């Protein structure tokens, strides 16, 4: 473990999970664009006459095809326009809270009149947005980097009006701190942390269960959840916990990707990852009638493992973080919930990695529900297999000598192996933009 005391590590991990586990309305990439524009507008007198957006390729890929909340339209240009019209930066990840038909009509008019431009930019942090707002008198440049609401700099008429202190220092500390831990360390912290500190975990469980219920009722996104439920009711799918996790996780993603206004608790800064971590663990907990406290700890463990994996793969990457990183978090939480020790927890993770490594990210959109549903059911199955001593052997394929080695291999694959693949995927998925 780190040179810090166990108590300090526990508090730092808790702080990190709280920071990366917050409610959001809508996909967080369009949210980041709208939030950046809305923040810049605060520094401007009068109306916004022109918005020039520059975004990282990952923001572009993950934001172009997902429906904006309370609308039936997609696009980062629309997101930017709405941020300038009705976005409130004080709302953070709820920046789309005030969107209505009148504001949407105004945003569409801005797009029609070419008020908003959108271009990708190279060699930036995966989470990067630069919004240049021009009015009658003022020009404001707002820069977001490293997090979906992390404003780094505001420049007003050529002068710096705001600059964040110690740029990236906290992120680097968090990254170093997480990489010093083992899965065993995280498991021990999960078991020892005071349950009184985990109230926010229960909030996320209830929030995402409600989102899944709404997703089953409303015709949003791909409507995969309700379609799977229909198949189950017709006797074509079972009623086991893996299938229920598949249905509910798909339904939550349908709602989120389809522009639903229901808030969703994120994990690692992503709503889909929040759904994929929380719902499968909750389904298994309800199936085995686990105590509330054990459910809370299992979900906390899932969030922590998801964040641990993402410190190697990156916040946004060429692989599907929702299916892989969040799925790994879910299976770890389930294995622990079922009474698994380190061998079984690690085994469940290895089973998931042997199964789903290579699932690429081709952008946020309605069909993300398919990937999430696959990951949710496989997370349940992988944990039960590990509990029955069915575990992929070490040093086979991507599987290394330990679970930590394997996660490091995944990170190498993402950053070194899939870097070019991400560019190719961007050219395929975003050819009409770039």
From Swiss-Prot:
Annotated GO MF terms: L-cysteine desulfhydrase activity
Any one biological process term the GO annotation gives: L-cysteine catabolic process to pyruvate
Any coiled-coil regions, as ranges: none
InterPro entries per the UniProt record, alphabetical: Ser_deHydtase-like_asu, UPF0597
Family: Belongs to the UPF0597 family.
Protein name, per record: UPF0597 protein CLI_2075
